[in-house]
UniProtKB/Swiss-Prot annotation:
Top-level lineage group: Bacteria
Gene name linked to the record: rpsP
Entry GO MF terms: structural constituent of ribosome
Keywords: Ribonucleoprotein, Ribosomal protein
GO cellular component term, pick one: small ribosomal subunit
Source species: Streptococcus pyogenes serotype M1
A Gene Ontology biological process term: translation
Entry keyword annotation includes Cell membrane: no
SUPFAM superfamilies, per database record: Ribosomal protein S16
The protein's name in its UniProt record: Small ribosomal subunit protein bS16
Length: 90
């Protein structure tokens, strides 16, 4: 089972916010997911982001592939740098 970390759209028309979910790559965008690991609100001035870093790092170490947008969000939050250090510190 190929697992991806991607955004799921929530909210109402013209006012979206997103959940950062871990899901099977074959599942629909807003369909079944395994776990919610964060949220992202692009409408707030500072792009409010909440992330469960320990869970994201665990899923990345298990081989989950982040989507391009989620990779950018995680990079801005500093999670990808921690994952890189954790991966190559062995």
């Amino acid at each position: 089972m190929a697992v991806k970390i991607r955004l799921t759209r929530m909210g109402s028309k013209k006012k979206p916010f997103y959940r950062i979910n871990v899901a099977d790559s074959r599942a629909p965008r807003d369909g079944r997911f395994i776990e919610t690991v964060g949220t992202y609100n692009p409408l707030v001035a500072e792009n409010q982001i909440t992330i469960k870093e320990d869970r994201v790092l665990e899923w990345l170490s298990k081989g989950a592939q982040p989507s391009d947008t989620v990779r950018n969000i995680l990079s801005k939050a500093g999670v990808m740098a921690k994952f890189h250090d954790q991966k190559f510190s062995k």
